[in-house]
């Protein structure tokens, strides 16, 4: 052991027996080339030529130094980063195999790979037997783990899993850097849907078999990639130790011990003292790899969920029997069915009020059906409850009839009250007409020639009331509105003239005739036209002027469409001549129209201010 200068780390010396001073530079270049390029076999051949054969102590020391230097290189550190993927692939393959075989104990990855490839080859030959399946079966039988993975779905030309594994295989064989991502690993899980052209009962098993084989190949390829240099060095170390007749060595410390046991005469020969860091004397890179491989690894919940999502879990026969046994123990015996039916509840009885109000017919029918069913079930011949119920209904009906007879006068009173209400409604409408007429008088006084416009306004109110009062047969309001309009147009007065009692009786007769049924529709129309003529003659009301809506209504009834398909009472032309009789306000209407036309001609549009 030699110590370096002050402040430098402690070093250790390893003698390289048989290395001349002239060959030291060539020896160092060979080791540096190995650390840079990684050409293990080429470097070992160069070292063998320097020592004139394999059975030499200097070659043994050189191989151990070479292995120790590789353990501290960046290349080896990168390969150690792949160890996690190796453990992941190993654990995933074993888990898939357990799911496939449905057992608890774990099996080695070699046994898993051999069993899965044999089972897959058997399924392809027996179930399909096509040319592609036969070729794949023969490839699987020759496969030893470290080879280019084939496409495990022979009926498809391309497979993402086979493409990814082929890339990993090429990188490992060329001893290049390998980087595996989680997203790339997901393509190794094959779903049952991808085997759609196989039998449905085979798809689940094919999915588990192919997924398991994919992870087995990933494990074997990456493991070979990590052990590539170390396995070659260890092989030559073992061969050299065998030729020298010494036990195999794996570290620099073991080499120092071995060379220290040799005779001093052998050590005095040509030798080179190689200095190494003291912390690397007992370092074995192969033991570090084994320590990484022996670490306990647990799959993440995401990976377990991915495995479970491939094929739903099926219960084994033992689990089915265990569950059935527990169900039998937890099941309680049900009570025996009763020998006789349970007693029926008493029938429902409806209590009807004596006020004369009877419920809906549907309620009575439903109650009768329920009571009839209940009574029929107890006594087919007839039950007293059913008779009693009919008696109650008959009593209530008789009471209702008596109430109806007793209230006959009341109904007449109600009818008279209804007529009084109609008269009050008519009076209210006439009052509103008088208010409209009074407003019209005020407009006449303020505007001079505004009498025609107010008269027209009064008739428009009469039109609205006429349209609304058709349902109430309100013809008085129309007559009063027309009279007010005509009186205001002629004299400018208030329009509150007395009505002829004869015309009132005629109006009532016409209203009664109009309110008859549809069978007397033609007669009602005739009487209505006759009433319109008399009203215009008596009150001075012009239907064509005062009630435009009324004209449209009568025109539709007389000269328009006849629902019964009969000829109208008057022709349209005769009816128009009848409506366009001698009207005292015809000239004023023309005058007002002429004013509007002048304003329209002068300005081009009508202005409300004018």
From Swiss-Prot:
> What gene, per UniProt, encodes this protein?
48
> Matching InterPro entries, A to Z?
Herpesvirus_BRRF2-like (IPR008550)
Superkingdom of this protein's organism: Viruses
State a single Pfam family of this protein.
Answer: DUF832
Name listed for the protein in its UniProt record: Tegument protein G48
Per UniProt, the ranges with Basic and acidic residues bias are: 384-393, 563-585, 598-610
Positions of region (Disordered): 327-353, 373-610
Q: Where is the composition biased (Pro residues)?
A: 335-348
Task: Please list the residue ranges that the record marks as compositionally biased, kind Acidic residues.
Answer: 394-447, 458-469, 477-495, 503-523
**Biased composition, class Basic residues, residue ranges:** 586-597
